[in-house]
Structure formats: structure tokens, C-alpha cells
Amino acid sequence: MVVSADPLSSERAEMNILEINQELRSQLAESNQQFRDLKEKFLITQATAYSLANQLKKYKCEEYKDIIDSVLRDELQSMEKLAEKLRQAEELRQYKALVHSQAKELTQLREKLREGRDASRWLNKHLKTLLTPDDPDKSQGQDLREQLAEGHRLAEHLVHKLSPENDEDEDEDEDDKDEEVEKVQESPAPREVQKTEEKEVPQDSLEECAVTCSNSHNPSNSNQPHRSTKITFKEHEVDSALVVESEHPHDEEEEALNIPPENQNDHEEEEGKAPVPPRHHDKSNSYRHREVSFLALDEQKVCSAQDVARDYSNPKWDETSLGFLEKQSDLEEVKGQETVAPRLSRGPLRVDKHEIPQESLDGCCLTPSILPDLTPSYHPYWSTLYSFEDKQVSLALVDKIKKDQEEIEDQSPPCPRLSQELPEVKEQEVPEDSVNEVYLTPSVHHDVSDCHQPYSSTLSSLEDQLACSALDVASPTEAACPQGTWSGDLSHHRSEVQISQAQLEPSTLVPSCLRLQLDQGFHCGNGLAQRGLSSTTCSFSANADSGNQWPFQELVLEPSLGMKNPPQLEDDALEGSASNTQGRQVTGRIRASLVLILKTIRRRLPFSKWRLAFRFAGPHAESAEIPNTAERMQRMIG
């Protein structure tokens, strides 16, 4: 009968095995520790035995000679073994370094072989193309030399790659050869070199001209803000200026370059004198060379003004349109004589009847230019420079006028209404024909800087004329004039213009809008191509009386070259209130004022010979020199 093993006995057996294993492990650890201790003790005893053997050797103990030799022999053997191991390790390290260097050299050789194959392939291909030319022209001249140089470079490159002797100088030689080949490849044919030089010379000359144009002149303090604008010109702007200048006749350019030495000496003497008032400061001689550029443009503008005066004015105004047909021939004569224009005097101009012909004043300009002192050699750049300065100085002038009027209103009480009759002056001072040009040319009484002074006279006179036309339109009581024209009431209009200029707020200076548009229309870079004014709308209001406010008037001025349609007049205040006869009379007066505006603009474009400047009679003015224009206009018309 079989008896089954008890599970408890098996568990006990397993526990016994585990305990035995643990005991054995502990014993093994103890034996290892004992072995380490014994080893340490052996090393210590060996060291002590070695030291004792050395000491005994010193004392020459014959008894312990064998023991001493054995001890020392064992020590020497151990030291030799250690030295051998160290030597082997050093040799192994050297061998490893040598292996690495050889492996690096092998990789470099493989790279050289690959480059040599590529170079030989390119050389073979190049020689095939060289020996079998398709085009006979390519086998001669510069192309053949370039191909031979390329083949020489490839052959040398292959030789240097495959020759191990020149490994050290390989990099330097390759760099030198590559530079030489690049120079050969980049060197164009002689014809191409000449073409490139011809193309580069005009650009360089244009750059030098542009820089010299901005730096060679001797500007005054008033012209300093414009210097930065001229330096920033580009080549295409200078080209445009040259193209515009090339359209002028050659004779005009020759006349503009003729400067008598008298004016130059006068200019040098006047530079050393004390500063003068801004209204009468001297201009440089270079200003005179810009007159010719505008003469052709003036003739066409005068023609447009003549068309307006002929087609849309009554017969009596045709007779009194300031002699456009008679003055055109005088303008051509002035065109040939305007090359040397006298500068403005330092004081008010004294006009003598015997010295100045009556008809010669028709060619006078009443507005000096604002250009800086440029030498005559840079006359072609005038049209480009003027457009930039015109825009900047116009904006600055508007702000200056507003500030001056605000200061006058703050400092002085409201000026009383001026008398409707202007003070009389001696008729011997000014000829009768000169009244046609200067009776609507008052200058601003405010103190403006030298930089803005040339604009003040032009723009203030333009405001006066526009204000006169506004008063003509806005005055229903004067519509039915006994004489049919407004010449009899010129003194009344004159006083109303003065009052309106003295009492208008800065916000009502609407003619400045027209002023900026006219400046941009006449003086912009492409102004010579426009040949006329663009449609300019001028809206303004005038207070003819302190108690009565006239309605807002809008006047549309559309003068242009070859204009065949009559100018449009939009009058919101007269719609349905005025009769047909009164509307025609008002329209005739407005057209006549339009003719005067165009003629005054024509007078102001070139440089002036004389300028008759007089001031408004204000609360602080000591005297007013204003010609009795009403009486003289009546005498001329009557």
C-alpha cells in the first residue's frame, strides 16, 4: 500500500533548502572578505620582505642571501611584467592612431580618384567639342582662346588631383587656377567692353551732374531747406529734366548763357552789403537763365486768354482787354531780350516816363522766382527742382499767412472801413500803360521770411483779383452799371477787397486752394506738357458789408488751350432772382475778370524786370502809395 507524501514535509524541505542557500551565501561572502584581507596582508608582508631584503643587502648578510635574492627576484619579475603591460598598451595606442590616419588618407585618395574621373570625363568631352567644331566662327578669336584656357585648366586640375607629390600645395594651386580661369571667362570681348563703357559713362555723368547741381550753388539762408530735396534726386528724374530741357530751342539756351560782367560785379558788391528788406532782396544772376523756359508756355496761355476775351466778352471789353493782340509781338521781342533781366532794387522802384517806354512794361513780370542760386550750367535741372520746392514752400506759405493774420487780429483792433475812394498819387511816377499790369498787384504787409517772400506777392495779388470777381458776382446793386462795365466802381471794389483781406478769418482764406492748384498746374515737372490750366474750382465768400452777408458763390474756371466752349458760371444766389439782362452783365464782368486773372498769371510766370510794390493802408501803416486806378481806367475806357 502506497503512502502519499505529506505536503507539510515538502514545505519543510523547501524551507531547509532556502536556509541552506542563505547560509552558503553568507559563508561565501565571509570567505571573499577573508581572501581580500589575506591578500592585503600578503602584499603588506611582501612589501616588508622587500624592504627588509634591501636592508639586509646593504648590511651584506651572507646568511640570508638566498632569501634576499628570492624575494628581490620575485619583485623584479612582477615589475617587469607590469612594465611590459604598459609598453604593450602604448604600442597598441600608437597602432590605433596609425590605423586612423591611414583610413583618413584612404578616404582622401578615394575622393581624389572620384574627382580625377570627373575631371578626365570633362576634359575628354571638352576636347571632343574642341576638335569637332560645329560653327567655324567659334573656332577663331576669343571663343577659341576661352575653350583652350578651359581645357588647360581641366588638365592641370586632373594632374594636381592625381599627383601625390603636391598634396601640400594642392589647395593653393587650385585657388590660383580657379581665379585665373574666372578672370578669363569673365573677360568680355573688346566690343562688349566698349559697349559697357559707353553705357556706364552717361550714368556716371548724370550722377555727378545731379550731385554737383545740388552742391555747386551758393544758396542764401532762405534756400537752405531745399538742399536736402535736391540731393535725393535719382537718375530717372535727372533724365526727365534733360529731356524737357532738350525740347527748348538751341538759340534760347545760347542767349541764356550770355551774362554781362556788369551784373556779376554788381552781385559781388551787393553780397558784401548789409541785409536788405525781404521784399527787395537781390537775386543771383543765375535766376535770369530760367526766364526762357517759360516764354513759350506764356505765349500759349496768352492765346487761350485771347480766345476767352474774343469769344465771350462784349465789344467794349474787346477794346479794353489790355491789348492782348498788340502785346503778343512785344512778348516775342521781350523773349529775345529777357536773357539779362535786371535784379530787384533794394528800395521801392522809381519809374521814369522818359527812361521806360510805355509798351515795354507789358513784358515785365511781377513775381520773382523762388529758385536757389544755381549756376547757368545746371539750367536743365530747373524744371525738376522747382516742382519739389514749389509744393513745400506753398504749404509753408499758407501756414505763415494764417499765423500772421491771427497775430494781427490779436495785436490790433478791427481796422475801420476804408474810404471807397483811393488816395491820389502823382501821375508822373507811373505811365498810363503800366496801370494795366500793376493796379491789381498789392503786396502783403506782413513780415514773411526770405524763403516765402516770392510767394507772398504772387498769391496775395491772386487773392485780390479773385475777391474782386467775387464782389462783382455777389453785388446785385451794381449789376446795372450806367456805363455797362465795372470800371467806374473800381475804387469801391478796391476798398472792399482791402476790407475783406483785413477782416477775413484764416478759415475764409479759400483762395489758397486755388493758389496751390495753380502752382501745381504751372510749375510741376510735366507742366510744359499740359499747356494750360486744369479745371480749377475756386469757392470763396466775401463780406461786402458788416451787417449784410452775401450768399456763397461758386465760380468754376476752365481755361485751356483751344477752348471753344464758353466758361460755365454756376451762381446759386442769382437763380430765379435776377433777370436775363442783369445775368448777362454779371457774366460779362466775370469773364472780364477771368481775362485779367489769366493775364496777371502770364505776367508773373517769368522773372520780373520791375515790381511796383505798395502796401495796404492799415491801422499801423504810415502812408499808402496806391495809384488812382479808377480814374485812369475811366480815362482809358472813355
Curated annotation (Swiss-Prot):
Enumerate the PANTHER family for this protein.
NEUROBLASTOMA BREAKPOINT FAMILY MEMBER 4-RELATED, NEUROBLASTOMA BREAKPOINT FAMILY MEMBER 6-LIKE PROTEIN
Report one GO cellular component.
Answer: cytoplasm
Instruction: Write down what this protein is called.
Output: NBPF family member NBPF6
The keyword DNA damage is assigned to this record: no
Report the sequence similarity comment from the record: Belongs to the NBPF family.
Q: Where is the composition biased (Low complexity)?
A: 214-226
Compositional bias annotation for Basic and acidic residues: 192-202, 232-251, 264-273
Q: Which InterPro entries match?
A: NBPF (IPR055306), Olduvai_dom (IPR010630)
Q: Name one Pfam family in it.
A: Olduvai
Where in or outside the cell is it found?
Cytoplasm
The record's annotation in PROSITE patterns points to: ODV
Gene3D superfamilies named in the record:
1.20.5.1700
Coiled coil ranges (UniProt) are: 10-43, 69-115
- Annotated spans, Disordered: 157-285, 563-584
Where composition is biased (Acidic residues), the residues are 165-179
The record's misc note reads: Encoded by one of the numerous copies of NBPF genes clustered in the p36, p12 and q21 region of the chromosome 1.
